[in-house]
Amino acid sequence: MGISLENVSYTYQSGTPFERRALFDMTVTIKDGSYTAFIGHTGSGKSTIMQLLNGLYLPTSGQVKVDDTIINSQSKNKEIKPIRKKVGLVFQFPESQLFAETVLEDIAFGPQNFGVSKEEAEQRALESLRLVGLSDELRDQNPFDLSGGQMRRVAIAGILAMQPDILVLDEPTAGLDPQGRKELMSLFKQLHLSGITIVLVTHLMDDVADYATAVNVMEKGRLVLSGTPKDVFQKVAFLKEKQLGVPKITEFALQLQEKGYSFESLPITIEEFVEVLVHG
């Protein structure tokens, strides 16, 4: 199931003295089965797009198409609710959304809210708990007694229990230590391999290079560049003009290039760099 934004604009607090336009005539397609990243500075419109994808925001103009459902400025909540089951949204610091007295109850809430029986919702909750790498033994614990990393996994399990076709991630590893970040990104990779479409907002270019199949560069509410990570990270001068970085290994390759080493194309992952060194 893919998503497309067609000439989408969005204005915060429209019609008030405080109105601010966040998106300008945005057109982009997120292909079914892709792992699509959005990069750009704070205020570029990335997080606004995330909340348009599952109907939390309605476009001021233009439309968002999710499968065969159209979201526009006139869409009603009853039309949008089924989309929120298909498109799971993981905010930054999703653990702040936890509320129930037990882990099981918290994870099962979403499916039950969409009409799933309590028994099936709890079964889904246990499956999702295992999927995010947590033990069934945590089911009766208060989520607020868990570590920060465990709380985040419980929050993500609550989204996965709704069995979304698309998972939208807004800086999902913010605040985690390196090991926790690695484990979570590995989980998202496995979910992508299982057939879930992933949409990632991040400022970590190494994650874009390692995991994404497509990347969109945002600036001041506009899409300024799209392509594969390999293609986008070749445009070093353009990215630096936008004050955006490249993967660490690409930066290292640029330093080697300055010393006379020649690359047919700049490597964007460590594996690619090693391949170039070994085979030329």
UniProtKB/Swiss-Prot annotation:
Major subcellular site: membrane
Compartments, record wording: Cell membrane
Biological process terms in GO annotation: riboflavin transport
Keyword presence, Cell cycle: no
Domain (ABC transporter): residue spans on this chain: 3-245
Pfam families for the chain: ABC_tran (PF00005)
Function: ATP-binding (A) component of a common energy-coupling factor (ECF) ABC-transporter complex. Unlike classic ABC transporters this ECF transporter provides the energy necessary to transport a number of different substrates. Expression of the complex plus RibU in de-energized E.coli allows riboflavin uptake.
Subunit structure: Forms a stable energy-coupling factor (ECF) transporter complex composed of 2 membrane-embedded substrate-binding proteins (S component), 2 ATP-binding proteins (A component) and 2 transmembrane proteins (T component) upon coexpression of the components in E.coli. May be able to interact with more than 1 S component at a time.
Family, per entry: Belongs to the ABC transporter superfamily. Energy-coupling factor EcfA family.
Protein's name in the database: Energy-coupling factor transporter ATP-binding protein EcfA2
Record organism: Streptococcus thermophilus (strain ATCC BAA-250 / LMG 18311)
Highest classification ranks of the organism: Bacteria, Bacillati, Bacillota, Bacilli, Lactobacillales
